[in-house]
Amino acid sequence: MEEKQPIINAVPAGIDGCGHYRIIQPALIMQQLGADLTLSPAAHFRTFGQNITWTQRMCNTSLLERMVKYKETTKQRFVVDFDDLLWLYEGESLPDYNLCRAKVNSEENTAGMAKYLDKLADKVTVSTDELKKSLLQFVDESKITVIPNMLAYKEWYHAQSPRPKKDIFYFAGSYTHYDNVNKKLGDFSQNLVHFLGNKKVVVKSLCPYFIKPEINYKASRLTTYANDFWKETRNVDFIIAPLANNVFNKCKSDLKYLESAAVGRVCLVSDFPGSPYSGAHPYQKIPEGTTTTGLKYIVERANEHYDEILKYQYEYLNKRWLDNNIGLYSEVLK
């Protein structure tokens, strides 16, 4: 009789250290060799007896409906987190250039949030004050806590490196923030394209196809891990984190500014009323509508004051280490 192949659920205690070497790596190789194996972040038995579910971006109507029924059955408390605007707020949601617009139906999400979110969420956490304001149409203010994005010190303490002074730029805008099919630049303004035309540029993820001939660019292979961001940016002088002036971007956080501070690079940021980068140093701000000549002046000035801006950025970051602020999460998850 043929021996039946076992079905394995591999559950490491953590993603680094012994968990990495004794469970994760052996499991990945066993998968490659044909084992019926799932590498899981949590075994099902660990959920027995839990009384809080902590989850993110619950805005899909059918999912919200099922989760409300699940909550009624299990009597659990739900803590729900949001870090982006995925519903209608002040008549807007995802801008027309955003790649995710097709799969995020704002009207449907808004209807689902209005019907189910207050029933589901005992507490809601958000990354910005503006995002909190947008949720007041669905949830009582007493349920909402603003916890800004932060960096874990153990992932970033090693990331500083001397700048190369090669006049190389790293474009850190999301690849979802422009529309290749309809040639909409979104956060990547035409003036910025003209300015970068004779510069060396590393572009995070994907470069808009229709401007490739206009800039001297190298594709980034960045993942979300801190180590990769450090590697990708160690040979650049400036990180550019552009945002168009719209409701969606006003709800976003200053995470790219924190990451730039951690790797020791000056971050050039968009400046408009309600910009998430309002707390940046004045010499690194790019006002809305800045011309190509204006961009040249801003970069020259930032070069002259590079160390001053770096110091400012790091002082800003020092208030936002996750290790020193973990109590914000502990308080919400009581």
Give the ranges of each region predicted by the language model:
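N-terminal pre-catalytic "stem/leader" segment of glycosyltransferase-like enzymes
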Residues: 1-60, 93
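A charged, aromatic-enriched C-terminal amphipathic alpha-helix characteristic of glycosyltransferases
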Residues: 293, 300-334
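Membrane-proximal helix-turn-helix segments that form the acceptor-binding/catalytic region
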Residues: 69, 73, 101-124
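Donor nucleotide-sugar binding/catalytic pocket of nucleotide-sugar-dependent glycosyltransferases
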Residues: 122-136, 140-157
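Acceptor-binding helix/loop patch of EC 2.4 sugar-transfer enzymes
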Residues: 14-16, 80-111, 174-175, 272
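Nucleotide-sugar-dependent
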Residues: 178-185, 226-227, 231-232, 237-262, ...
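Conserved catalytic-core segment of nucleotide-activated headgroup transferases in glycan assembly
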Residues: 9, 13-25, 149-234, 257
